């Protein structure tokens, strides 16, 4: 396992440009490894806003991480050589960070009347009930946001619904998510890509943190770049004040997203 390594490898290939892949790519680069980060999609963190992907990739590349966005890995040879669409890359270690799949096969769920999707995620409603209303499912196996805090929220709702009044609901739309890179990334709700696909009418409000006086002083003393100070985008339902989604990139983004979650 990756977390059982006792020495920092000279080079490492990381497959997957999601939150875990980006976080560990930056960590390993700072520890001294030559890092190759592969993502089949055109951008890192493909589920997030485009400005997040651009800013994060730029930051990683400034630190020496070689980012292979839009470069699908075709195979691995000898446990050390990555063969991708762009070429061949030899690394001392390879980390696969391509997400999780449910381990539900063989549980006999179909015999219990529990339906699953094609991948094996049990189908659940807003109260966490499967298609067998006496059986609940929570956590990563459901295929929803695979975050510790989301599973915790599901567990609290499960206790309420299974043992007491069946009234608790869990909404992934109001569950925040963070990626602990530098700059830090945090988001909640929908992105512009999602709303465009849904043809939802919305208005966009944006703000660069370096427009704040406090940041301007820090910028003069530290000589940092503008994108390092942060940027926020808030999406609001057109003609109203309902927040549909928000994204922040910058220092303490995971903390700064909290008021927006409350407002939603």
Language-model features, listed with the residues they occupy:
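Flexible, glycine-rich terminal cap/loop adjacent to redox cofactors
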Residues: 163, 180-191, 196-264
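A short alpha-helix-loop-beta-strand transition element characteristic
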Residues: 115-117, 165-176, 200-205
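Glycine/Thr-rich phosphate-binding loops of Rossmann-like dinucleotide-binding domains
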Residues: 23-24, 45, 103-106, 145, ...
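A Rossmann-like FAD-binding core segment of flavoenzymes
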Residues: 31-126, 190, 197, 201, ...
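FAD-site-proximal beta/loop scaffold in flavoenzymes
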Residues: 1-9, 89-164
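Rossmann-like dinucleotide-binding cores of NAD(P)H-dependent redox enzymes
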Residues: 3-4, 9-13, 19-78, 145-152, ...
